[in-house]
Amino acid sequence: PGIHPLADAMSLADIEAYPWPDISDPTRVAHVAAKTRRLAQDGRYAILGCPWLLFPFERAHAMQGLDTFLSNMLVEPEFAQAMLWRIEGLCKELMGHFLDAAGPELDIIKIGDDLGTQDNLMISPALYREMLKPVHADLISFIKSRTKAKVFFHSDGDIFDLIPDFIEIGVDILNPIQPGAGRMSDLARLKKTYGKDLVFCG
């Protein structure tokens, strides 16, 4: 019902009652093996894979509405965390199927979450570390247990304050360098401060 199907959800039971997509459906990754093989045979470029759905925070606030989900992160944290972990479970399941299909030719795997505005974060660093960082860390750990591909993390906005967290949880490539987005527009500073630990892209 409506554009935010869990806008009125209040309980853990509401989350479990929602008809989540069937990630086991093989048609979701049916094209991946052949396309990866073709790109590998071409041999001119690194191969980047980007499975659908792998942005837990974005999916959560799409399901509830941004204002509602941000409020729930503060006033109903158990509910908000359950939503994030439910979505992350789907992300991991899809990622597993995708990596199985892609095989060892994959060079880079893209995940992410838009966490910034043009001049700051959407949530505080403390709230990120409490609620979202464990979700991202678990997904990245799963990826690295299944592939040698580098982890490419996309997040729009000024996310400068979270860069040490991204490095800690295993992000290899951070995207984008975004003109007009505060400290994320200063490539020289980014490279000087974090260039030994992170590749900046885009």
Regions found by a protein language model. Give the residues of each.
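Active-site loop segments of alpha/beta catalytic cores
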Residues: 2-3, 7, 15-202
